[in-house]
Amino acid sequence: CWPWFPGQEGGGGLADVLFGHAEPGGRLPTTWPAVLADAPVTRTRPDGGRLDYDEGLHLGHRGWLRHHRTPAYWFGHGLGYTTWRYEELTVPPVTRAGDGLTVRVRVRNTGARAGREVVQVYLARPASALDRPARWLAGYAAVRARPGETVTATVRVPARALRHWSVAEHAWRTEAGPCRVLAGRSAGDVPLAAEVEVVPTASA
């Protein structure tokens, strides 16, 4: 158990979680390597007083995904006292560039006690002509459910999650074409997928 920096009341809070009086709701904001050699920082050394980070867009979990490596714990990973089944992902078939989209994810609490789940939505553009991460976090929502209960998480994906920076135009742009929408528990656990078509507009 890693409580980060919980403050002066951290002991009581941690005890409540360990004894099952409270549901742990935190999710990892980083990726933890299974072996140190998989961490890019181990290959970064200053040269002549200059320190270059050459991962570009492929930082953190994006790098693990790009190189098909499995870390010890993915970005977004977290534990709880119940289990969940991801049942259905609903997305609009089409969205206009600049509009964003609303994603709905149906999940079922399959455990024996009430719980809280952080439903995460990622985007991917495998057919893109641009250098893109394998997938990136676009939004999330927390839901609570009793044992056996099915609930729907509604995640609003903002328009900026679909944009990229155009170096040539010095502006944010939205690439038209198919976009994969994935939903799951972490960057490496996304059991549901769907596709939305991004159509161009004059301003995007």
Question: What residue spans do the PLM features occupy?
Answer:
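Terminal connector regions
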Residues: 158-204
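Secreted, periplasmic, or luminal enzymes acting at the cell surface/secretory milieu
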Residues: 1-116, 122, 176, 180-184, ...
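Short acidic, flexible loop segments centered on an aromatic residue
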Residues: 112-129, 135-137
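Intrinsic-disorder/low-complexity, polar/charged segments enriched in Ser/Thr/Lys/Arg/Asp/Glu/Gln
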Residues: 100-102, 150-154, 191-193
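Intrinsically disordered, low-complexity Pro/Gly/Ser/Thr-rich segments with frequent PxxP/GP/PP motifs
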Residues: 129-167
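Generic structural detector for well-ordered beta-strands
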Residues: 85, 90, 106, 139-146, ...
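Short coil/turn motifs at secondary-structure junctions
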Residues: 110-112, 126-128, 160, 186-188
